[in-house]
UniProtKB/Swiss-Prot annotation:
Keywords: Pyrimidine biosynthesis, Transferase. The gene is pyrB. It is an enzyme of class 2 (transferase). Catalyzes the condensation of carbamoyl phosphate and aspartate to form carbamoyl aspartate and inorganic phosphate, the committed step in the de novo pyrimidine nucleotide biosynthesis pathway. One of its GO terms (biological process) is 'de novo' pyrimidine nucleobase biosynthetic process. One of its GO terms (molecular function) is amino acid binding. L-aspartate binds at residues 86, 169, 224. Gene3D superfamilies: Aspartate/ornithine carbamoyltransferase (3.40.50.1370). This is Aspartate carbamoyltransferase catalytic subunit. SUPFAM superfamilies: Aspartate/ornithine carbamoyltransferase. Pathway: Pyrimidine metabolism; UMP biosynthesis via de novo pathway; (S)-dihydroorotate from bicarbonate: step 2/3. It comes from Natranaerobius thermophilus (strain ATCC BAA-1301 / DSM 18059 / JW/NM-WN-LF). Its EC number is 2.1.3.2. It comes from the Bacteria.
Amino acid sequence: MGLQRKSLLGLKDMEKSEIESILDSTESMKEIVQRKNKKLPTLKGFSMVNLFYEPSTRTRSSFEMAGKYLGADTTNMSASASSVAKGENLIDTGKTLEAMGINLIVMRHPLAGAPRLLANNLSCSIINAGDGYHEHPTQALLDMFTIKEYKGSLKGLKVTIIGDIYHSRVARSNIWGLTKMGADVRLAGPPTLLDQRVFTEMGASCYYRVEDALADADVVMALRIQRERQGKTLLPSLREYARLYGINQERFKLAKKDALLLHPGPVNRGIELTSELMNSEKSVIEEQVTNGVAIRMALLYHLSGGEDNGDIA
């Protein structure tokens, strides 16, 4: 079963079967990423634009690579170097791109709901590459794929997410996705960065002591402290955060012996994670980056109607 939609705006409203379809397709895409000749004609004639209103290295680059590996015409566009800087509004920008024949827009925006606004006003496909605090669905999908690769299944796993939960669109998408797949999601962070009421209603368990959340975990995911989104009163200091919530090898021992360590990046070394732990065999952070290209290839394939055209390779 393919995706029953033309756009990917979030995982909250995505069916479990759709997530499974994407994860299954990603296995084939990863084989393509890892081989010497990566170029395919699958999306020849398909045009996509990466429209980013916020800085990005991993997400934008991986979408660009994903499109190029499948043969799509891919263009990167930053808000600061476009008519947006002259005051053009979002819908007008989208309509301009659509008038040029663009088939798909990948968009990152600081305001929650911006991708949905665009999707409601355009006929081309939209992929949400992160909107405010709301969602970052492709990051959660690549996280789930990475976990599934190592653990075989997501069902019944205890997944602990630690850090700046309040400002994290990655955490929100992971909660929606992982709980749909049957995982037990635990959250840990300072009280100022973890609203128990909101996240409990989403299906996660909340802890203020990181040690309690780490106990017997199958997967540990650290999140970046988003200093650009915070007021100065939310954390006493980064040193204090590292002391209470930073993950080091001693704390990591509270998780299961075969526990995995994930981080969406970029990492503030010595704050969220120690370099020693990040460089250990527990870490699958580099694998997440590889899988990010593969998961985005799978999404482009599905949203372009690629499954109607036969085999990938």
